[in-house]
Amino acid sequence: SKSVMAVECDHALTQAESDKLCWLFGEATPESEENLKGHFVGPRREMITPWSTNAVEITQNMGLDGIIRIEEYFPVKDENADHDPMLQRMYKGLDQNVFTTNRQPEPIVHIEDLEAYNEKEGLALSKEEMDYLKKVEKDLGRPLTDSEVFGFAQINSEHCRHKIFGGTFIIDGVEQESSLFQMIKKTTQENPNKIISAYKDNVAFAEGPVIEQFAPADHSKPDYFQVKDIKSVISLKAETHNFPTTVEPFNGASTGTGGEIRDRMGGGKGSWPIAGTAVYMTSYPRTEEGRPWEEILPVRKWLYKTPEQILIKASNGASDFGNKFGQPLICGSVLTFEHKEKDEVYGYDKVIMLAGGVGYGTQRDCLKGTPEASNKVVVIGGDNYRIGLGGGSVSSVDTGRYSSGIELNAVQRANAEMQKRAYNVVRALCEEDNNPVVSIHD
């Protein structure tokens, strides 16, 4: 068979319920055996997939009650078949325990050797940062826990803090009066034109026209649509996702697009994405013969994927997320380059993947408010797993420094369906006459 569907329910299915499921699965045949032999690739027991969430919701809309989880498993030739170990696992046979998990939470670990833990987990902490953590340990009178050190590494990484761009530069012994970030911001400060917000939020906003908003009168219930004029702002956003796309092109580019869309959702007190773009830069892909300019350098042994594989898979990943989310990828560009100048060799061996896009919001919601002690903090989205953690710190060092396991784990995995659900909430709040959001962030 092409695939096997496993259904978890809280009661024995009636014949009518079983018939409905078979119809839903494309006239599938019920399996009479409780145990299936062979090798199968499917989702990890511990992780309910976005596909399952959607499938269960469809069964609820069909009037099928009591279905908890539905997952799909694919027969493979042997245990060496290719799969993503972060999201999938190899099953040697399928049985009634396919959804059973016996894992217990790992105990809190106190870190006795910060230097060793820093290298082991790929946290990219500098000597100064570790000296600071040791001072914190001394003040607390105890070693820091693994969660505390890991959390510090993420929020204090170069990816998040922009320590280089925001730092003080001393050139030839002379301290420079401006940081790189201050120099970048100077253009907008001296010539703001119609810029409303830049370099201080998830996205930049420029003044837009008065437009018609076509939206339900009340999002909390089924209601009639209405038209009203709103003063708009135009959002612009671009960011690179180089390290993840180098390591795992499909998910790297997919989550680059997804993260950039979230940034346009998280501007001010909420805003709307419209369309996206993508840029790819790699070394020569060597897809065809007869291109003498591509022979300027010998073919290297690539650490992860070849430039050809990266261009194909990254393009597929970026488009895949946009398609599933509902945002078209309308333009982009590709640059491939290698060069040798005397003994110097140049090339985009570490890939550039830039995701960008435009959107819009309301002038009412384009600036964040100041949170107060009495405000509520609300988190929406999917289940949390240890996926993509470490990306901010691992991407701050040279690709290939850490083990492939650490680097592959640091790449996020896309969940466009869940992101669209979160976006529906953000959009509903922004389209209401009174938006309760004070500040929003992804």
Task: Give short role names for the model-derived ranges.
Residues 1-399, 404-437:
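Core nucleic-acid recognition elements
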